[in-house]
Curated annotation (Swiss-Prot):
Cofactor(s) demanded: [4Fe-4S] cluster; [2Fe-2S] cluster
Family listed: Belongs to the radical SAM superfamily. Biotin synthase family.
GO molecular function terms attached to this record: 2 iron, 2 sulfur cluster binding; 4 iron, 4 sulfur cluster binding; biotin synthase activity; iron ion binding
GO biological process: biotin biosynthetic process
Textual note on the cofactor: Binds 1 [4Fe-4S] cluster. The cluster is coordinated with 3 cysteines and an exchangeable S-adenosyl-L-methionine.
Record-linked Pfam families: BATS, Radical_SAM
Assembly and oligomerization: Homodimer.
Organism: Burkholderia ambifaria (strain MC40-6)
Catalytic activity field: (4R,5S)-dethiobiotin + (sulfur carrier)-SH + 2 reduced [2Fe-2S]-[ferredoxin] + 2 S-adenosyl-L-methionine = (sulfur carrier)-H + biotin + 2 5'-deoxyadenosine + 2 L-methionine + 2 oxidized [2Fe-2S]-[ferredoxin]
Described function: Catalyzes the conversion of dethiobiotin (DTB) to biotin by the insertion of a sulfur atom into dethiobiotin via a radical-based mechanism.
Name listed for the protein in its UniProt record: Biotin synthase
Domain Radical SAM core stretches: 55-282
CDD domains recorded: Radical_SAM
PROSITE patterns: RADICAL_SAM (PS51918)
Length: 339
């Protein structure tokens, strides 16, 4: 009987300063993707248990504080002014309304509150309200995250001074596939914003979207980019494309759910101390596949009935699933990785 051998994947030592040799070559990440499913899951769960409580998941709520009218042409996004999705552009929400939503999220079990604005970048006139939102949400005892588009150095520092815990700015996909999805913002623009966030002392939340028509190698390219950031992000959201009517990616064939689970597992292995977040597109997975995601190393999920402008599984269904799996909601402090 022929024995199947798997490739040994040995990342280099973690660099202490940039520029540095890559820790994860794309070929190494592809080798992880191509492991037999059971082997990949076993390895991911081993890594996960080394650094986190395997039965604890952080609940996050995401609020769109400024919806629609975005200048960017991201092919997946209903909020782009380039696409006819029927979404009406709205102004930035009042601070009090945002804080009311944060209180409701906390009452519903969330320990993390994310605020997203459909902008290319915030204007200086927006900053006082944004920093007030951060301070107000933190006073409620919630972990804070914002995603506002590209930032200047001064804006990143203002958010840091307000106490922002995380700033989300996704790479979206690999450098090779990026141009097929977005033309109004370069890959380097995204990397520059991440550098500004890091330099300001804010934790980085950075992931991507899979299922946009990219190849497995291009998915591996995204993970390689994320894992080779120095340091890699503290928070890594993995989104499953929601093919929204009126966007260029409308009608894109759904990704095999097992490939989504594989991506979660590979993210966990390559970024062992990151919080891997099960994000948009979760409603496309049945309960069994969501359970697989937790087994693969996802330890946070977006919770609530709406995720920006796409639907999310209902909270009652989420609670029922947690009960069936023996998973408990965890606060932000418990999400700190073990050494």
């Amino acid at each position: 009987m022929t024995q199947v051998q798997t490739a040994a994947v040995q990342p280099d030592a973690i660099p202490v300063a940039a520029p540095a040799p890559q820790r994860w070559r794309v070929a190494d990440v592809v080798a992880l993707f191509e492991l037999p499913f059971n082997d990949l899951m076993f390895r991911a769960q081993q890594v996960h248990r080394e650094h986190f409580d395997a039965n604890a998941v952080q609940l996050s709520t995401l609020l769109s504080i400024k919806t629609g009218g975005c200048e960017e042409d991201c092919g997946y996004c209903s909020q782009s002014s380039h696409h006819d999705t029927g979404l009406k552009a709205e102004k930035l929400m009042d601070v009090d309304a945002v804080l009311d939503a944060a209180r409701a999220a906390k009452a519903n079990g969330a320990s993390r509150f994310c605020m997203g604005a459909a902008w290319r970048n915030p204007k200086e006139r927006h900053m006082p309200a944004l920093t007030e939102m951060v301070r107000g949400v933190k006073e409620l005892g919630l972990e804070t995250c914002m995603t506002l588009g590209m930032l200047e150095d001064e804006q990143a520092q203002e958010l840091a001074n307000a106490g922002l815990d995380y700033y989300n700015h996704n790479l979206d996909t690999s450098p090779e596939f990026y141009g097929q999805v977005i033309s109004t913002r370069t890959y380097q623009d995204r990397l520059d914003t991440l550098d500004r966030v890091r330099d300001a002392g804010i934790n980085v939340c950075c992931g991507g979207i899979i299922g946009m028509g990219e190849s497995r190698r291009e998915r591996a390219g995204l993970i390689s980019q994320l894992a080779n950031l120095n340091p890699y992000p503290e928070s890594v959201p993995i989104n499953n494309l929601v093919a929204i009517e009126g966007t260029p990616l409308e009608g894109t064939a759904p990704l095999d759910p097992f490939e989504f689970v594989r991506t979660i597992a590979v993210a966990r292995i390559t970024m062992p101390k990151a919080v891997v977040r099960l994000s948009a597109g979760r409603e496309q997975l049945d309960d069994a596949m969501q359970a697989m995601c937790f087994l693969a190393g996802a330890n946070s999920m977006f919770y609530g009935d709406q995720l920006l402008t796409t639907s999310n599984p209902q909270t009652q269904r989420d609670r029922a699933l947690f009960e069936r799996l023996g998973i408990r909601a965890s606060d932000a402090d418990a999400m700190q990785a073990n050494a």
